[in-house]
Amino acid sequence: MPTINQLVRKGRSPKVAKTKAPALKNNPMRRGVCTRVYTTTPKKPNSALRKVARVRLAGGIEVTAYIPGVGHNLQEHSIVLVRGGRVKDLPGVRYKIVRGSLDTQGVKNRKQARSKYGAKMEKK
């Protein structure tokens, strides 16, 4: 516990909040180029083959980004839009690829939550 005199001399330093997506540099989204597209397995107790991509962002930073939805058309040198948002069962994956923008196609035959997966409204 500081004395009044110590507080007068130094004051209290404000707590600095650490960002959860540092590679985006305070932007909501960032453009990048896929350097590698592959699958990984989640940590226990889950079991699957999660689709992820290694992306070199516009600032030159390389991040691992998750590809959401069923099926994708991404390959090496695809230009993608990356947003923040971690995948809980994949350690080190703190970013997601935005579906339906740039080279990424939206999810086919998607009826619900379409805006999250870049799916257009189905024609009647």
From Swiss-Prot:
Pfam families according to UniProt: Ribosom_S12_S23
Ribosomal protein found in the keyword field: yes
Cross-referenced SUPFAM superfamilies: Nucleic acid-binding proteins
MF (Gene Ontology): rRNA binding; structural constituent of ribosome; tRNA binding
Cellular component, GO annotation: small ribosomal subunit
Keyword tRNA-binding tagged: yes
Sequence positions bearing 3-methylthioaspartic acid: 89
UniProt KW keywords: Methylation, Ribonucleoprotein, Ribosomal protein, RNA-binding, rRNA-binding, tRNA-binding
Biological process, per Gene Ontology: translation
Segments for region (Disordered): 105-124
InterPro entries for the chain: NA-bd_OB-fold, Ribosomal_uS12, Ribosomal_uS12_bac
Record's subunit section: Part of the 30S ribosomal subunit. Contacts proteins S8 and S17. May interact with IF1 in the 30S initiation complex.
Function: With S4 and S5 plays an important role in translational accuracy.
Family: Belongs to the universal ribosomal protein uS12 family.
Protein name as annotated: Small ribosomal subunit protein uS12
Species per Swiss-Prot/TrEMBL record: Renibacterium salmoninarum (strain ATCC 33209 / DSM 20767 / JCM 11484 / NBRC 15589 / NCIMB 2235)
Origin organism lineage: Bacteria, Bacillati, Actinomycetota, Actinomycetes, Micrococcales
